[in-house]
Every structure is written in structure tokens, then in C-alpha cells.
């Protein structure tokens, strides 16, 4: 089966841009303390590009690869603690969850091989257990004919820099009871609609507390849980599922969480994928875009 027959092609424009620009030296790389989160059809159209997409700068390709590596660390940790099978290839990572978690595919390179694309197409085509998400941080794979719908989200990074102290109580979570509180906040507040109604331990198994590099934070307002997030340290740090419960929004919970995250991860660059609602906060604290990912679902 060819790549076109599989319903997946590589888009030359974005991938070429990544190949042609020489990598910029990353000023923080010298720091010694970094520690390790349908049916096949022909496709010829280019992947969707948002009209307001920022141009990439020199060095963004290297930083985007680091962000992608962190996402691979996240999904590996989740898969192994949830006991979901993982397919690992140089060009992609696939997690085969249950009927609620679904199939998750993460492209790990801007230049997946023809074999990678054919295998991804087969995974998508044969999946019958629930939802499907294919995350392409590089925006170079075209799944237009795969039966999936695309959306674009910016991938951002922030170099190490001072940050104000959080204005609210934000504490790390290190026991199963408080982890369950974080899990409820994220599932209901983010929300993780696929994992509703809430089932204890489904999103965040207690085994994640023993996973190196994985950390949970809980924000409280007057002693009541108000927000939460998950971080992963690999070559860089990644922030995931930063959530404020609806009844506590517009009260500085998200900013307090982010201040706490950046303070805890001081000395390490921090990456995230930004929602439209969260983008102004990230911009205000020095995050900058390094790519525009395409998520297919």
C-alpha cells in the first residue's frame, strides 16, 4: 500500500521549512541539571493552516522536537500506568486505550516515513474501540482523507526566567487521596469529556505518583479545590491539563497555578500546547510559539 492509498501524505511546505532552517543554538542547553509527559482514500490537499499562524524562527525546529519528546514521555507514562498497549516507532507513538480513552497517535518527527504513514492509517482505519486523536506537532502530515477533522493549536515554550510567587495556595500532590481530587478537577473542569462520568483512577492511576518526572499540583481557594495540573520533566518540562473549575474562574487560579509550575520547574524550559482562552496568560509570562500543531480527531 502506498502512502496515498493509505490516506496520508506528507506536506512539503511545513516540513521543508523545518529542514531548510539551520537550528539556533539554545542558550539553556548547557545547564547540567536537566532531568528526564476510516477508511483509506487518496489525499492530495495540503493540511489546514490557520491564517494567523506565526512564522517560525531559527531554532524553533529544535525546540519543537523537545516539546514533542516531552509529549511522548507523557503518553508513555499514561499508557504504562493505565496498562494500555503502546506501539513505538522512530516516527510515531501510538497508545491503544479502551473504549473511553480511545486511540492516541503522536507523530515524533516532521518527516515520517512512508511505512510510518501506512501503519498510522491502518491503526486509524481498524480502530473500533472509541475516539481517535492523531497529534502532529509539526503540521506536516495530511490526514484530510482519513475521516478525521483537524484543528490547529500553538506549541509554546518558555526559557528559564524568574516568576512571581503564586497568589493562592498551590501544593504538590503526593498521596492517592489528593491525586483523586486532582483527577476530579481535571476530568470535570478541563473537561475530559471522554472520561465522563468520572471513574476514580481512570485518568490518573495512583502509579503515576511513583513515575519519575511526573508531578501534580493542586490549587485551593479558602481550602476548597479550585484548579489543578500535571507536569512532566524530560529533556524539558511540559505542562498539561491546567484546569480551573468553572465556579472559580476569573479569580486568578490559572495564573497562580502557572506561577507555581514555573517556580517548581525553575532552571528548565517549559513547553505547552495553548488553547485560545489560555494564550493571553501564557504570552504574559514569556511563552512564545515554536510551531502550530495539527490535531486530527
Q: Where do the language-model regions lie?
A:
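N-terminal charged segments
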Residues: 28, 32-128, 197, 210
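Conserved acetyl-CoA-binding loop-helix of GNAT-fold acetyltransferases
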Residues: 116-121, 244-246, 250-263
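A short, well-structured alpha-helix characteristic of acyl/acetyltransferase catalytic modules
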Residues: 175-189
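Conserved beta-strand-loop-alpha-helix junction that forms the acyl-donor binding cleft
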Residues: 134-139, 246, 270-281, 296-297
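Acyl-donor-binding surface of acyltransferase catalytic domains
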Residues: 38, 108-177, 293-297
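Conserved active-site alpha-helix within GNAT-family acetyltransferase domains
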Residues: 139-150, 255, 276-293
Amino acid at each position: 500500500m502506498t502512502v496515498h492509498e493509505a490516506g496520508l501524505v506528507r506536506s512539503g511546505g511545513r516540513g521543508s521549512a523545518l529542514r531548510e532552517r539551520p537550528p539556533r543554538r539554545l542558550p539553556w542547553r548547557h545547564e547540567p541539571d536537566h532531568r528526564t509527559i476510516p477508511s483509506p482514500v487518496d489525499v492530495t490537499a495540503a493540511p489546514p493552516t490557520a491564517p494567523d499562524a506565526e512564522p517560525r524562527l531559527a531554532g524553533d525546529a529544535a525546540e519543537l522536537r523537545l516539546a514533542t519528546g516531552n509529549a511522548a514521555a507523557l503518553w508513555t507514562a499514561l499508557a504504562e500506568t493505565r496498562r494500555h498497549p503502546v506501539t513505538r516507532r522512530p516516527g510515531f507513538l501510538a497508545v491503544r486505550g479502551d473504549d473511553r480513552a480511545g486511540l492516541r497517535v503522536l507523530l515524533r518527527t516532521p518527516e515520517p516515513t512512508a511505512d510510518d504513514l501506512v501503519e498510522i492509517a491502518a491503526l486509524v482505519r481498524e480502530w473500533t474501540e472509541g475516539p481517535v486523536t492523531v497529534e502532529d506537532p509539526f503540521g506536516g502530515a495530511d490526514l484530510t482523507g482519513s475521516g478525521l477533522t483537524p484543528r490547529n493549536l500553538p506549541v509554546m515554550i518558555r526559557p528559564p526566567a524568574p516568576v512571581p510567587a503564586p497568589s493562592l495556595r498551590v501544593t504538590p500532590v503526593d498521596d492517592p487521596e489528593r491525586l483523586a481530587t486532582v483527577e476530579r478537577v481535571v476530568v470535570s473542569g478541563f473537561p475530559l469529556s471522554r472520561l465522563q462520568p468520572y471513574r476514580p483512577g481512570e485518568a490518573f492511576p495512583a502509579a503515576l505518583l511513583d513515575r519519575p518526572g511526573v508531578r501534580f499540583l493542586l490549587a485551593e481557594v479558602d481550602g476548597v479545590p479550585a484548579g489543578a495540573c500535571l507536569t512532566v520533566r524530560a529533556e524539558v518540562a511540559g505542562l498539561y491539563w491546567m484546569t480551573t473549575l468553572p465556579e472559580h474562574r476569573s479569580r486568578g487560579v490559572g495564573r497562580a497555578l502557572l506561577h507555581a509550575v514555573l517556580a517548581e520547574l525553575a532552571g528548565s524550559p517549559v513547553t505547552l500546547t495553548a488553547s485560545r482562552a489560555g494564550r493571553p496568560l501564557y504570552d504574559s509570562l514569556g511563552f512564545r510559539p515554536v510551531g502550530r500543531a495539527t490535531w486530527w480527531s
